[in-house]
Curated annotation (Swiss-Prot):
PANTHER family listed in its UniProt record: RIBOSE-5-PHOSPHATE ISOMERASE 3, CHLOROPLASTIC-RELATED (PTHR43748:SF3)
Protein name (database record): Ribose-5-phosphate isomerase A
Active-site residues (renumbered): 105 (proton acceptor)
Pfam families, per database record: Rib_5-P_isom_A
Binding, substrate: 28-31, 83-86, 96-99, 123
Assembly, per entry: Homodimer.
Family the UniProt entry places it in: Belongs to the ribose 5-phosphate isomerase family.
Source species taxonomy: Bacteria, Pseudomonadati, Pseudomonadota, Alphaproteobacteria, Hyphomicrobiales
Enzyme Commission number(s): 5.3.1.6
Domain of life of the native organism: Bacteria
Pathway annotation: Carbohydrate degradation; pentose phosphate pathway; D-ribose 5-phosphate from D-ribulose 5-phosphate (non-oxidative stage): step 1/1
Length: 236
């Protein structure tokens, strides 16, 4: 069973959580894309929802599927957010931001009564950090900010390298908000809360990809033979 099949299986389990009339935060990334496609089918079948997208890419995908959209200014309180994750541990702590939408994703999730993660089971880890941790930073003073982030990482007991994210053409990636991304290749984050606090203390850091105390549940799809087996971490 392929990774896209598993992502679709996780998304299928999340679809029944969406009720008529909901105000829905809609995530970014390949698993969220599977959810958007299924949600579009439900909308065309008569489901009434209003979505708030977490990125321009998600906005375009939702519009293509005919999903009604609003901004967070228009709908400042959401019922549910469905989004993917790059890593999730047993305490529902996440690393997100591989799709460069971490700031908007965190704002939308924080505005929601509930956040449910959908992912294939390979994203489930014992300790966060194998996936590079994204840190969104202001372009002004990026050199000084990078040095301060390096010091924060060391003070939090982490070891690794920090690189600026580049696109496939070798150009620096900019977020939808016009900020740069640093990827922290740490391998292991022994104390995510400590690292989060250290990063927040750095002037120039706009947001980081540690989502702590935000997710309520994670739907994880694993392959067993040619079947997808879906498990739930937390409470749906």
């Amino acid at each position: 069973m392929s990774a896209p099949d598993l992502k679709r299986a996780a998304a299928e389990r999340a679809i029944p959580l969406v009720e008529d009339g909901m105000r829905l935060g809609i995530g970014t990334g390949s698993t969220a894309a599977a959810f958007i496609a299924l949600l579009g089918e439900r909308v065309r079948a008569g489901l009434t929802v209003t979505g708030v997208p977490t990125s321009e890419a998600t906005r375009i995908a939702c519009e293509r599927e005919g999903i009604p959209l609003a901004t967070l200014e228009e709908l400042p309180e959401l019922d549910l957010t469905i989004d993917g994750a790059d890593e999730v541990d047993g305490n529902l702590r996440l690393i997100k931001g591989g799709g460069a939408a971490l700031l908007r994703e965190k704002i939308v999730a924080a505005a929601s009564r509930r956040m449910v993660v959908i992912a294939d089971a390979s994203k489930r880890v014992e300790t966060l950090g194998a996936f590079p941790l994204p840190v969104e930073v202001n372009l002004f003073g990026i050199g000084a900010t990078t040095r301060a982030v390096e010091a924060a990482v060391a003070a939090a007991g982490c070891i690794g390298e920090i690189v600026r994210r580049l696109d496939k053409a070798g150009q620096p990636v900019l977020t939808d908000g016009g900020h740069a991304l640093l990827d922290l290749r740490l391998g292991r984050i022994p104390d995510p809360e400590a690292l989060s606090a250290r990063l927040w203390a750095v002037p120039g850091v706009v947001e980081h990809g540690l989502f702590l105390g935000i997710a309520d549940a994670a739907i994880l799809a694993a392959a067993e033979g040619d079947q997808a087996v879906v498990s739930v971490l937390g409470r749906l």
